Amino acid sequence: YSRVLGKTTMSIILGINETTHDASVTLLKDGKILFAGHAERFSKQKNDWYTNDELIDHALSYGEPDRIAYYEHRWLKKARIITRGGFGGEKPYYLNRADLKWVPRESFSHHYSHAAAGYYTSKFDDAVIVVLDAIGEFNTTSIWIGEGSNIKPVKKRNYPFSFGLFYSAFTQLVGLRPNEEEYIFMGMAAYGDWTRYYLKVKEY
């Protein structure tokens, strides 16, 4: 995130991912990870959507952040949910923390966060980056070009056209939990007869 935020001096950044499955935080100092943890390890609630005091306190024991980096644009996500007949999305738990209230915050698009996580932790100086998931704010598929310290979007596709949601639907169809057990479904695929339903799925 130090590269993403354009920081060249020593800085401590708290990266936060929540209000979705598997909430997590990461604390970085000058781009080096000091702490990273999932909320579920502290709350004992599988796939916990929210951070909690124990997790945040543990992260802050490694240093006080100069800035908070949030993994999506909440107002865009809220707009998408409302336009689809929902109620607007949840409030992140970390906003309840008085000690984080005045820390400068910066949000990044959901798919940019995916792209950055893959590219900036790789050993490549340039790369084509493909993001496929269920849904970000609106994006479901995106292609990026990484060059040096820069990432720029090339092409995007928006909800409801989503390979990730399509895959999760099949995960649920075979009796597994969507947004959790897709990896089991993927592993099972190697033992099945792919031709059995291929034409039906292709027609869809």
Segments and roles (model prediction):
Residues G6-Y204:
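Short acidic/glycine-rich loops and adjacent helix/strand connectors
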